[in-house]
Amino acid sequence: MAKNVVVVGTQWGDEGKGKIVDWLTDHARGVVRFQGGHNAGHTLVIGANEYKLNLVPSGIVREGVACYIGNGVVLDAHHLLSEIRTLEAGGIRVRDRLRISPGCPLILGYHAALDRAREAAKSAGDKIGTTGKGIGPTYEDKVARRALRVYDLFDRERFAAKLRANLDYHNFVLTQHLGAEAVEFGSVFEQAMADAEEIRPMVADVSAELYAVNKSGGSLLFEGAQGTLLDIDHGTYPFVTSSNCVAGQAAAGSGVGPGRLHYVLGITKAYCTRVGGGPFPTELDIETADTPGQQMSSKGREFGTVTGRKRRCGWLDLGALKRSIIINGVTGLCITKLDVLDGLSELKLCTGYMLDGRRIDLLPMGSEEVTRCEPIFETMAGWSGTTFGAQSWEALPQEARAYLHRIEEICEIAIDVISTGPERDETILRRHPFGA
């Protein structure tokens, strides 16, 4: 019987979703991206090979698995083709296994120009920390009903007319408001037309194909990008991304009915990280040697896959995690990077906050309120043994098991999967999301 699983990040992204999606793909006929764009960075370690993906779903490294880019994704076609060529150079078949929705809004040259110019114009405290890849401006065009979509690529005259209208508008903003250079029509148009011919064979009715997979008994895996706390509606606004990153978006962003989403796996690091600006209640110093924050940063290799920026690190925030569990309807948790905490003498869990003199247990909405939150910590014993590469619950140090049990108790949810390293087999399974 077909069973569909949604994988979402419960923090500020970078939770290790790519490895888990790859690991789960053994039980899926297809993997689906449903939001975001090439601002996502998923790193997979398969034997001696490391793959860094932005747009192509993580299931692509599994032979025979179909991959889908749903209508909720904003698509930089030129970047996608570059990513495909890199994978093909490594011996991975892509083009006959990848399907792209014709409804994807297109990221074009002026979107990235707007993104960079706006960020440059902001004062230091107001900077979002955008990747500068044009994601936000493209979603703006979609909501304003002026976006060019994949299906527009295949009508040259229509595409040219819409592009001219968009450039008239956006070049005015770039030159008159932001003091940046205008984007030239010819270069954008010719690049888009060249890319169109190359992606045309991969464009398909993704919604209908996903329905057909389920109807024939095949299961699907929906791969979220970024994380719940970066969601445009539910995140620490305005320090968020421009898409919905939550489980509910899997339906809208791919064209499947919500009743066909059967299990939601919430991916959670054993600590917290954040890239870019915005409030972070449990943040630690990552620069001072021999401190917990510095260990998380260095041992966890906490650098952005897309930007290369050093990630901010802090203790696990259960108030934020509980908020994410509620929003996503999480069925079970997957804890990643537990091994990064090996060797710390004590650990802290944020169990709530003091906000304006009163205790609250859930992360509030809006960055202003989150900034005023003072974390309430519970201290637990660390462990001297190693969790790295553990493949069974019994192989974990007693203190590590106690740490995980406490997360389950406070969040009132089961930890179904534990990742203890980057390789596929460095995983502890307690309950399989696909019911296998």
From Swiss-Prot:
Active site as annotated: D14 (proton acceptor), H42 (proton donor)
Where's it mainly located?
A: cytoplasm
Q: Which residues bind Mg(2+)?
A: D14, G41
UniProt entry keywords in alphabetical sequence: Cytoplasm, GTP-binding, Ligase, Magnesium, Metal-binding, Nucleotide-binding, Purine biosynthesis
Q: What does this protein's record comment on cofactor binding?
A: Binds 1 Mg(2+) ion per subunit.
EC assignment: 6.3.4.4
- Which positions are annotated as binding substrate? T305, V306, T307, G308, R309, K310, R311
**Residues involved in IMP binding:** D14, E15, G16, K17, N39, A40, G41, H42, T131, R145, Q226, T241, R309
Under catalytic activity, the entry for this protein gives:
IMP + L-aspartate + GTP = N(6)-(1,2-dicarboxyethyl)-AMP + GDP + phosphate + 2 H(+)
Q: Where in the cell is it found?
A: Cytoplasm
What InterPro entries does the annotation carry?
A: Adenylosuccin_syn_GTP-bd, Adenylosuccin_syn_Lys_AS, Adenylosuccinate_synth_dom1, Adenylosuccinate_synth_dom2, Adenylosuccinate_synth_dom3, Adenylosuccinate_synthetase, P-loop_NTPase
UniProt GO MF annotations: adenylosuccinate synthase activity; GTP binding; magnesium ion binding
Binding residues for GTP: 13-19, 41-43, 311, 337-339, 419-421
- CDD domains xref list: AdSS
Enzyme superclass (EC):
ligase
Cofactor dependence is on: Mg(2+)
Determine the domain of life of the protein's source.
Answer: Bacteria
Record-stated family? Belongs to the adenylosuccinate synthetase family.
For this entry, the protein name equals Adenylosuccinate synthetase
Lineage at the top is: Bacteria, Pseudomonadati, Pseudomonadota, Betaproteobacteria, Rhodocyclales
